[in-house]
Design a protein with these regions (language model features):
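Intrinsically disordered, charged low-complexity linkers and terminal tails
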Residues: 1, 124, 159, 177-180
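A polyanion-binding, active-site-adjacent surface
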Residues: 1-136, 140, 144
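Short, flexible loop segments at boundaries between secondary-structure elements
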Residues: 50-58, 142-175
Length: 180
């Protein structure tokens, strides 16, 4: 089990209510990862998801960073789990990334079938993941709840991410809990 898998497994809920499927882990040399507990910079996917779920429009980013372990435990308790479409970092243009993700679809389907139960809601995060996976996963009978791509919350996509992600969660029964 690699470092990414170990960090992710620590926060796997017993029952996954919402399976968030993102693109790929970052380069290991970056020192960044959604489930790494000690992050002082970057971490946009984690920060933006947690703002929507727990902190609203005016979050205390230093509080979030200092309490990442506690926040990840709440994320786990609420039945959220983040997986990547691809097990390894990918680079290139959007077209190249889509191709790489499609090549890994059999592995992703297998992983999702092991994780998702009948009531698990699956959310595809980023245009590349949506374009590469949506149709095939729907054909597989998986419960993908977004019918359009959700912008990755980096490089200017934060507002679109927040709007789409929060509306989707509300539509599918998650009561957003602002804690700070």
């Amino acid at each position: 089990m690699n470092k990414f898998s170990q960090s992710r497994a620590k926060y796997k809920p017993k029952i996954i209510n919402y399976l968030l499927t993102a693109e790929a882990p970052p380069m290991e040399s970056s020192g960044r990862f959604f489930y790494y507990e000690n992050m002082s910079k970057g971490d946009s996917l984690f920060l933006e998801i947690m703002k929507v779920l727990y902190f609203g429009d005016n979050p205390n980013l230093s509080y979030i960073r200092q309490n990442k372990n506690k926040i990840l435990k709440q994320f786990q308790k609420d039945g959220f789990y983040l997986e990547d479409s691809v097990e390894f970092p990918i680079e290139g243009t959007s077209r190249q990334k889509i191709k790489q993700i499609k090549e890994q679809l059999p592995h992703l389907k297998n992983k999702i079938n092991k994780l998702a139960k009948e009531n698990t809601k699956i959310i595809l995060i980023s245009a590349t993941v949506f374009k590469a996976c949506y149709e095939e996963l729907i054909k597989e009978g998986l419960k993908i709840i977004n019918r359009e791509s959700i912008a990755f919350p980096g490089s200017g996509g934060q507002k679109r991410f927040k709007k789409t992600f929060s509306a989707l969660l509300k539509e599918h029964g998650f009561n957003i809990k602002l804690t700070h």
